[in-house]
Swiss-Prot record:
This is Uncharacterized protein YBR126W-A. Its main location: endoplasmic reticulum. The keyword Transmembrane applies. It is found in: Endoplasmic reticulum; Membrane. It comes from the Eukaryota. It comes from Saccharomyces cerevisiae (strain ATCC 204508 / S288c). One of its GO terms (cellular component) is endoplasmic reticulum. Keywords: Endoplasmic reticulum, Membrane, Transmembrane, Transmembrane helix.
Amino acid sequence: MAITPDKQKKEQQHQPQNGPLDYAHICKCIAMFFVVAGVVLMFFETGLDPEQKEQIKRLHQLDGIPHA
Protein backbone atom coordinates (compact mmCIF):
# COMPACT_ATOMS: atom_id res chain seq x y z
CA MET A 1 0.00 0.00 0.00
CA ALA A 2 2.98 2.32 0.50
CA ILE A 3 3.82 2.27 -3.22
CA THR A 4 0.57 3.88 -4.43
CA PRO A 5 0.95 7.22 -2.58
CA ASP A 6 4.47 7.53 -4.03
CA LYS A 7 3.15 6.90 -7.54
CA GLN A 8 0.39 9.47 -7.01
CA LYS A 9 2.93 12.03 -5.80
CA LYS A 10 5.13 11.39 -8.83
CA GLU A 11 2.17 11.70 -11.21
CA GLN A 12 1.08 14.94 -9.53
CA GLN A 13 4.61 16.31 -9.89
CA HIS A 14 4.79 15.37 -13.57
CA GLN A 15 1.39 16.73 -14.58
CA PRO A 16 2.14 20.44 -14.05
CA GLN A 17 5.42 20.07 -15.98
CA ASN A 18 3.76 18.43 -18.99
CA GLY A 19 1.47 21.42 -19.68
CA PRO A 20 4.16 24.08 -20.23
CA LEU A 21 6.46 21.58 -21.96
CA ASP A 22 3.75 20.61 -24.45
CA TYR A 23 2.91 24.29 -25.05
CA ALA A 24 6.57 25.14 -25.64
CA HIS A 25 6.92 22.12 -27.93
CA ILE A 26 3.91 23.26 -29.99
CA CYS A 27 5.35 26.79 -30.22
CA LYS A 28 8.69 25.37 -31.38
CA CYS A 29 6.95 23.27 -34.03
CA ILE A 30 5.00 26.29 -35.30
CA ALA A 31 8.15 28.44 -35.32
CA MET A 32 10.08 25.76 -37.20
CA PHE A 33 7.24 25.47 -39.72
CA PHE A 34 7.41 29.21 -40.45
CA VAL A 35 11.21 29.12 -40.67
CA VAL A 36 11.11 26.21 -43.11
CA ALA A 37 8.38 27.90 -45.16
CA GLY A 38 10.43 31.12 -45.30
CA VAL A 39 13.55 29.27 -46.40
CA VAL A 40 11.61 27.40 -49.09
CA LEU A 41 10.12 30.67 -50.39
CA MET A 42 13.55 32.32 -50.42
CA PHE A 43 14.97 29.30 -52.25
CA PHE A 44 12.30 29.54 -54.94
CA GLU A 45 12.84 33.32 -55.26
CA THR A 46 16.61 32.98 -55.69
CA GLY A 47 16.47 29.62 -57.48
CA LEU A 48 14.63 31.01 -60.52
CA ASP A 49 16.61 31.64 -63.67
CA PRO A 50 16.84 35.26 -64.88
CA GLU A 51 14.71 34.28 -67.91
CA GLN A 52 12.00 32.90 -65.65
CA LYS A 53 12.10 36.10 -63.58
CA GLU A 54 11.64 38.12 -66.79
CA GLN A 55 8.68 35.97 -67.79
CA ILE A 56 7.12 36.45 -64.36
CA LYS A 57 7.68 40.23 -64.61
CA ARG A 58 6.01 40.25 -68.04
CA LEU A 59 3.06 38.28 -66.69
CA HIS A 60 2.68 40.74 -63.83
CA GLN A 61 2.86 43.67 -66.26
CA LEU A 62 0.20 42.04 -68.45
CA ASP A 63 -2.01 41.52 -65.41
CA GLY A 64 -1.53 45.17 -64.46
CA ILE A 65 -2.80 46.43 -67.84
CA PRO A 66 -6.55 47.12 -67.71
CA HIS A 67 -8.36 45.06 -70.29
CA ALA A 68 -10.32 47.09 -72.87
